[in-house]
Amino acid sequence: EICACLVGSEMCIRDSKEALAAVGSVGPIINSLIGFFMGLSTGAGVIISQYYGAKADEKVSRTVSTTLVMTFFLSIVFTILGIFITPYMLRMMSTPNDVIRESATYLKIYFGGVAGLMFYNMGSGVLRAVGDSRHPLYFLIFSAVVNTVLDLLFVVSFGMEIEGVALATVIAQCLSAVLTLYVLTTTDGPYRICWKKLCMDWSL
């Protein structure tokens, strides 16, 4: 994510100072989101790792299912809420008037694809909880590379400016989420996702 921001900032420098300021002004909001989602995934991972270590396969499966369902509903809430309150958040942060429009554009696109960030963090949290830290790292590197390539394509080649920077980030995050969910769907472990059986287990 840091790499993505750096690349995006570099692309904005090529465009205008206003675009660079817009990316910088939304940094605290995005960092807070990432920290919040990482906290949720860590909490879920602690529970899953305890059940996994105790060989309680049924509880592992139920916890993973609950985590995915919770992520789905939270992603809807954050997407809708984020898009609508973006202008208010920027005003509360005293964002300069000359960059508030571009900052709002970036944030609205980012919130539109925030599900990718959430599912990647939750999925990677599950994988790390069962001892697989390799796949999340690979997918994170892959996401950073894709983000860099798309930044160059959208901003430099297509001249999409701030929209291109935001769209590149969203696409890269969604791809990493898809890869993470694919691993969880195809594994033979008790943490495998069975899409037809997903449900919330309120007893956990």
What are these regions (language model features)?
Residues 20-80, 117-136:
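Small-residue-rich hydrophobic transmembrane alpha-helices
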Residues 32-35, 147-152, 177-181:
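Hydrophobic transmembrane alpha-helices of multi-pass small-molecule transporters
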Residues 71, 126-152, 167-170:
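Alpha-helical transmembrane segments of multi-pass membrane transporters/permeases
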Residues 9, 43, 203-204:
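Core transmembrane alpha-helical segments of multi-pass membrane transporters/permeases
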Residues 10-31, 97-102, 162-163:
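Interfacial/gating helices of multi-pass transporter permease domains
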Residues 10, 45-46, 86-87, 124, ...:
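Interfacial helix-capping/hinge residues at the ends of transmembrane alpha-helices
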Residues 1, 48-115, 157-204:
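Short alpha-helical transmembrane segments in multi-pass integral membrane proteins
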Residues 1-8, 12-13:
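Single conserved hydrophobic/aromatic residue that forms the stacking wall/gate
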